[in-house]
């Protein structure tokens, strides 16, 4: 997205990462971003839920090698957030609760961790003046064969 001066606007990319499968999906997401969009200048933020009463276990990324790979090799920033409403009972709610950990005046794009980046993101016309969410609500899951 171009800003008013005609230059590309910096934005962050946000995914939720936590213990288990989402750790490794976050690593693959970050690796695909760095490979396919090496000129991306924004921050890659891994939003990580913290332990608390809504989690019967510690949801943080517990694989230290993966954590090191994300932060030191792939340049991600891990930011924590508290689960106040969803937690383990509805882990998809982490996407909503992760928003509280973001800087309010900084534009961002939220991706699911099971996404692979296949090309430069500066070709996508994100409009940060008109926030939106995916409108794909039906027929987005494969039909069982």
Question: Residue spans of the language-model regions?
Answer:
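Glycosyltransferase catalytic domains, chiefly GT-A lineage
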Residues: 1-145
């Amino acid at each position: 997205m171009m800003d008013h001066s005609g230059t590309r606007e910096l934005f962050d990319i946000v995914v939720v990462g936590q213990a288990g499968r989402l750790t490794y999906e976050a690593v693959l997401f970050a690796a695909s971003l760095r490979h396919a969009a090496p000129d991306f200048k924004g921050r890659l933020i891994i939003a990580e839920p913290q332990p608390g009463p809504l989690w019967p276990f510690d949801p943080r990324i517990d694989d230290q090698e993966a954590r090191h790979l994300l932060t030191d090799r792939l340049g991600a920033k891990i930011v924590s957030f508290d689960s106040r409403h969803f937690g383990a009972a509805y882990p998809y709610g982490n996407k909503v609760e992760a928003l509280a950990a973001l800087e309010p005046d900084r534009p961002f794009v939220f991706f699911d961790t099971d996404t692979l980046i296949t090309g430069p993101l500066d070709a996508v016309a994100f409009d940060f003046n008109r926030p939106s969410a995916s409108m794909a609500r039906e027929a987005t899951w494969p039909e069982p064969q």
